[in-house]
Amino acid sequence: MSKPVPDLMTNRLKLSTFKETDIPSIVSLANNYEVAKNLGRMPFPYLVKDAEFFLDKIVTTELTWKISLLDTSEMIGTIGLRPIVKDEVSELGFWYGQEFWGNGYATEAANAVIDLAFKELALLKIEAGHFLVNEASGHVLKKVGFTQTGTSLRDCMAQNKKLSHAELELKSINFVSPPAHSK
């Protein structure tokens, strides 16, 4: 995805471009086994070199946003779209610091990114997934309109093993923009 990352605003969140100065916040939020054990591509422990890799290799090749609280500018997580089929299909991924779980932030940010993906980027489909043990992410994905298409085994770096993984999709023809105040 070579398009610039546009800032997105919701009622409570600002989604924006990462900067080098975000490295300490990234490490602080990501260096938590409870976070890393639910993600395929996140190592644990999560060190400064991992945040540098994230900024240099992931943020530069994927459409990735830093998620911050609108009222305090505190970083709470990240969300992004990884291209699968150029200009047609991307994969949605997100993670949040543990202290920010359960507040509806994931749903709020996902709705904003999905809306942009279908309306501005003209994607036809977005895929996503979650480890079956991570029911909270599954709930978020279903809440924003994804439907399960199957299961697979996927690597989990932090756990150093393969885990059962739900595969989901959302097609643009099935997407309904949420009200601006949804969470």
Please describe what each predicted stretch is.
Residues M1-Y33, S68-K183:
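Acyl-donor (CoA/ACP) binding surface of acyl/acetyltransferases
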Residues L55-K66:
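A short helix-loop-beta-strand connector motif used in the catalytic cores of GNAT acetyltransferases and
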Residues P6, M42, L63-W65:
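Flexible, nucleotide-binding loop/lid elements of kinase catalytic cores
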Residues V48, K57-I58, A122, P179:
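Prokaryotic Sec-type signal peptides and long signal-anchor helices
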Residues E34-L55:
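Conserved GNAT-fold acetyl-CoA-binding loop/helix
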